[in-house]
Structures are given as C-alpha cells and as structure tokens.
Amino acid sequence: MEQQPRKMNAFDWVLIFSTLALAVLFVISGILPNLPLFQATIFGQDIPLFMLSVWAWLFLFWIITNVKRMTGVRFTRSNKIALLVALSVLLLYYAYSLMTRQFIYYWDYVLYYRMQVGISKSFHADGFFNGIIDVIKSVWYNSYSLLNNVFLAAPYTFVPRTPNLFVAISAASILPSLYFLIAMFIKVVERFIQPKHGSLFFIGGMTLAVGFPLIHRALLFGQPDLLGLIFVFLIILLTISYDFSKTDFLRYFLLIVLIIMTCASRRWYMFWLVAYFVCYGVYVILQAILKKRWSDVKRTVLFTLATGLTLAVVFLPMIIVVLRAHYSVSYSAYNVSGFSGELKSQAQYLGIGLLAVILTGTVYGIVKSKTRALTIFALIDVFFTIFIFTRIQNMGYHHTLILVPAYLLLMLICFGGICRLEKRWMLALSSTVVLGFCGVNAAVCATSSAESLPSPFSNVALIPPQRTDIQQIRAVNRWILEHCSKGESAYIIPHGYPYNPDVFRSCDYPDFSVSKHVPYGSAVLGTHYFPDDLLLAKYVLTCEPFCNLSLAEKYNTAFLSEIPQKHFTQVAQFDMGNGYIFYVYERILPMDREEIQFYQDTFAQESKQFPELFSVVWDELIKELK
C-alpha cells in the first residue's frame, strides 16, 4: 500500500525558502567572507549565527508538526490545561532554583556555557562559512558537538552572558518542546492501554513526567543534553505504531534526519539508537514473518540499508575516529562497576518507590496482551542499552537520559492499569498512592542537595551544592591575577570536590581573566595528559585536605617530594573558611633533567599503559631543555 502525496502548506514553503536563503548565504560567505553582513551583530551575537539558530528551531518545529499529524494525536481542552500547568510549574521551579543557588559551574557543568561563548566568537571572527564547518567538525571529532549550541544561540542572544542565564535560556527553550512531545507520547500510549478514565490518565502521566527527577538533573546543573531527548521522543512517536505495512517516504526521511540529529547531539545517544533500533527491527521483521507479509520485510530491509548508507556517508570521519580509539581503555577510569554495578546505580537513581511503580507496570504490562509487546520491548531496550553502554563506562545522571523513555513508559503502563479500575474507591486510593508518592519523591529531590537520599526516594538531588567559600575563591583568583603576567600560569593540583582548577576558572564568569592563567588541570588516567605545568608553571597550588580524583593525589605526592620541592618555595596560603587551606608554591629554579627524570620514574607504569599521554609530553619537555 503506497502513501498518498501530501499537499504543501505555508510552513513547508517557509522552511524551503529559509533553507535556500541559508544555503545561498553559506556559499557567498565561502567566496566573500568579509562582506559587512557576515560581521554584523545583534545584541553582540553574530547575525548569521542567529539566523542559523532560528532556522534550526524552525526545522525542528516543522518536524514536530509533521509527527503530530502522522500520529493523529489530538489534545482535549483538559489536556492542554494540564500541559500548560505542568510547564508553568517546571519553569517556576527552574527560575526559583537559579535565583536562590550559590553554585560554581565546573567541568561538564560549565562546558556547554564555554562552548556557547566560543561559538559566538568563532562565527564572528572566522565567518559564517568557517563557523558551520567548525560545527560539522565538532560533530565528527569531538565528544561534545556544537549542535546544541546552535539551537541555543538565538534564545541566548537577548540575555547577559552568565552561566545561570544560560541554564535559564536552555530550560525555556527545551522544556516546552520536550513536554509537548511527552504529552503526545502519553496520548499514543493511551491507545494501547485504553484506560477507562482518559483525562485522569493524561493528568497522571504528565504528573509522572514532570516529577521525574532524572529528566531535570543534568539541565539544572548546566548540561542541556536534554535537547537530544526531543529527538529521541520524536523517533519513538514515528516508530511506535509503524510496522512497514505501507510505504511512507516522509516518515523515512524524518527518521533518518532525527537519527543524524540524535547522534550529533551527544555521541552517547548512539547507545540508545543501537539498542532501540535492534529491538524495533527484530520486532517488525518477526511480526512480518509470522504474518507472512514479505513486502513489509522488504521495506524494513531497504529502509535499514538506506539509513546505514546515509549514516556511513554523513558520519564517516566520526566512524573512523571511533574505530581507531580504544574507549574501553581510555575511559576505564569511568567504568567503575560494569553492568551489574550499573543496575544497582539505576535502582538507586530511581529509588525503591519509583522502582516499585516500574516493576508493577512491568508485571501488569506483560499480563495484559495489549501491552505485552510494548512492555517486553521497553525491558529489553533498558537492559540492552545498559549492557552496551557499560562496555565502555558507567552512566552518570546525564547519560541516564537515554533510559528515561522506557522508564516513563513502564510507569505509564502501571498508572494505565490503575485507570482501568472500575471501583471508584480503588481508583481513588491507587491514584492517590502512586501520584502522591511521585509528588513527594519529586519534592524531596527538588529541595535537596545531599549526595545520598533515603532509599525510598530517587537518589537525584536537584539543588546543586551551595557554596560558602566564593569570596575565598575570589581572593585566590585576585592573587593569581596580581602575580601572573601575560603568558605565566598557576597550576592547581587538586582535581576533586570541592576544589579543582575549574572551580577557580569558572568562579567569575563571564569574566574569563583567570582562565588565561589557570589550566584546566589533569587527573584522569587514560583521558588526561601528564600535567607539564608541574614543570612549567610559575606557581603551583595544592590544598589540605587534598581533593582527589584518579591520579591527582599521586601527582600531589610527587610534587611534594624532595626533588621537585628543590625548585619551589612556598609564598602564600589561603584559609578557605571550611577546613581547607590552599598553599601556593613559586618556582625558583627552572626545570631540569633531574626533575623530568623524577616524574618519568614515578609515572613509569602509567606511561607504559598510555605512552601518548605521558612519554610524548616528557619528550617535548626534554626538547625544551635542549
């Protein structure tokens, strides 16, 4: 059965003309990069980058409108009110959280902010053509791509360039689209479950989604990886009820585009893509074989081949990088407990309460024939995703976003079973217990900054640790700025929490002055290079008690040993007011062969395992001596 051609609408033409306009600008910028248009700004933002960002959102909204039409989802008045209330509650909470926090974004929490500042400078300095090339290269070669920053460039144009406002703009940009798609997802799942109380099911589903802490942790801490979840839900909506029984070229196009966007958003979303499409492909082909619908098998295979070929062409440089890299070795510091340990971590992330809801949904879904396939699919998807992910590393809070759709589906199945109850007192009691606990769980997480929460609740504190030492950190920064001239650096050895180099670098953003003198630091075996600043920096800082991560304490012990200390003298110390004291050492003798040899001997084992991260650095230092 072939699809009927769809009539073009106004939105289609707007997208076509805007795409052509951007393509023309791209070509012209490659030929005439110095045209005034390519140097023009709006509120300090490069206008061509602003236009690219607007186009990206336009394209995404076009996809969403097409997916909504293809799924046939219709919202009732009560559905729209519930969605609006849910978004209002979320945005108010995000605003409150940002206005009341005393937090310094560091490491992955601040990386997207830095990239946002960087992409603006790069488009303005290098031009529109080279800016787009940089975005493409970041997708191919970097662990963090600039795709998310392209989407956020236009909204971020109109606010001061602070980390808190970056998080605020990310939330205001991403959450409405994401929860609109989650609302569509709830309506589609409703068709499978067929609850007797549809309005209650939708309101309960939105309550479960809004109060699910794992959705919010990454974004509240400065990581807008949530954008990729928009693409994930779009893929699910396009496939959940499609079995290749008819040809649908627009659906194929949208799926391929969304797969590309998902991969480009964050590389680890590929684990979800592999697990999901393996499960989906096996299910569709088995169904077709059992029903002897060979044309469905043919369409599935042809779509798979077309998708694979497209991805191979688009991501060829990335594929080469991935195949050449040994991530299981270089990321070994992040693989702390493997598959079994990750299952335990996921149980802790969820908490006993939500785990009980998910397990209840699993049992109910398997028992009921209408939801059996969907439930088994979700279970296999979760375990398969975790299994392949832990071949490389364990999952952090942001990585767990790829499990959110399956978790949410199983919770919806549980609540859908409740909404099929006929006795009103049973319906009222069960709904109150499930939604009441989820509300309490959300409140506990939303008001906590503790590292560990009671086991009945999700171990996902949504309030960042509140700092009381910001003035002390600024005092250290002022000292560094006063004592370091251009080209001089101060290396900070601690690399854990509460202190690491990035805490000092990020303290006064958007003022980047300290970052010019304080390097990012080095600690993670297999990922970070040997810190040559131990031998090159004018100042080296350490603290007591020490803040360790991976190799940081070994670097600290080595630095405080006799041979390196012959080259330094202590010149200052800072009481941080919380039991930590920082000591500043100034280099009084230049590095020599004895000092280099000491580090070579101390880290011989690490160099044997990762020569490109150690020996290569030492060889360069020896060349400098010569």
Provide a role label for each language-model segment.
Residues 112, 118-122, 273-283, 287-371, ...:
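Transmembrane-lumen/periplasm boundary regions of multi-pass, lipid-linked membrane glycan transferases
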Residues 1-95, 199-202, 298-307:
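Start-transfer (signal-anchor) and selected internal transmembrane alpha helices
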Residues 99-110, 123-150, 171, 345-349:
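Membrane-proximal lumenal/periplasmic loop motifs of glycosylation machinery
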Residues 217-227, 396-397:
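Short acidic/glycine- and proline-prone juxtamembrane loop motifs at membrane-interface regions
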Residues 142-180, 218, 222:
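Loop-to-helix entry region of an early transmembrane alpha helix in multi-pass inner-membrane enzymes
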Residues 66, 165-195, 234, 361-366:
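Transmembrane-helix motifs of polytopic, lipid-linked glycan transferases
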Residues 462-492, 497, 506-626:
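C-terminal luminal/periplasmic domains and tails of membrane-associated envelope-modifying transferases
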Residues 432-482, 496-502:
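Membrane-proximal, lumen/periplasm-facing interface regions of secretory-pathway glyco-
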